[in-house]
UniProtKB/Swiss-Prot annotation:
Similarity field: Belongs to the universal ribosomal protein uL16 family.
SUPFAM superfamilies found in the cross-reference section: Ribosomal protein L16p/L10e
Organism listed in the record: Methylacidiphilum infernorum (isolate V4) (Methylokorus infernorum (strain V4))
Protein name per Swiss-Prot or TrEMBL: Large ribosomal subunit protein uL16
Subunit organization: Part of the 50S ribosomal subunit.
Record flagged with keyword Ribosomal protein: yes
Gene3D superfamilies registered for this protein in UniProt: Ribosomal protein L10e/L16
Alphabetical GO biological process terms: translation
Biased composition (Basic residues): 8-20
Chain positions covered by the region annotation Disordered: 1-26
Keyword Ribonucleoprotein assigned: yes
CDD domains hit by this protein: Ribosomal_L16_L10e
């Protein structure tokens, strides 16, 4: 069961790149689970990377526990067809990304022993292009 993470409808199909300054101010604390994965760097995380991390976690926990994905790819990234000359307007949306700033909680887990949750998050972190850290409700520290 693959989850295609992309918005159902958007007001504007093509978005500007924007700048990724500062740290996350929202989504920085555990809201659902007892364990979480927190971003330590800023990046665009694609829908396929989020899905790969989700699959890695679910394979390790084997139907036990509950997983929450706290980021959603709502920004389109456009690309031009190969071997196309410059100009002639902006390309078509190629994929979707979630803008992640340092301090943002990416995934949360509950209903598992801490060691299992930690190993699951380690496997998922290998699928992501940023450094992350494992946090628990007891040891929640600010970035």
């Amino acid at each position: 069961m693959s989850m295609a993470l992309l918005p159902r409808r958007v007001k504007y199909r093509k978005s500007q790149r924007g700048s990724r300054k500062g740290n996350a101010t929202r989504g920085t604390e555990l809201a659902f689970g007892s364990f979480g994965m927190q971003a330590l760097e800023r990046a665009w995380i694609t829908n396929t990377q989020i899905e790969a991390a989700r699959v890695a976690i679910m394979r390790n926990v084997k139907r036990k526990g509950r997983l929450w994905i706290r980021i959603f790819p709502d920004k389109s990234v456009t690309a031009r067809p190969p071997e196309t000359r410059m100009g002639k307007g902006k390309g078509q949306p190629a994929f979707w990304v979630a803008v992640v700033l340092p301090g943002r909680i990416l995934f949360e887990l509950d209903g598992l022993p801490e060691q299992v949750a930690k190993e699951s998050m380690r496997l998922a972190a290998a699928k992501l292009p940023i450094h992350t850290r494992f946090i628990t409700r007891e040891r929640l520290v600010k970035v």
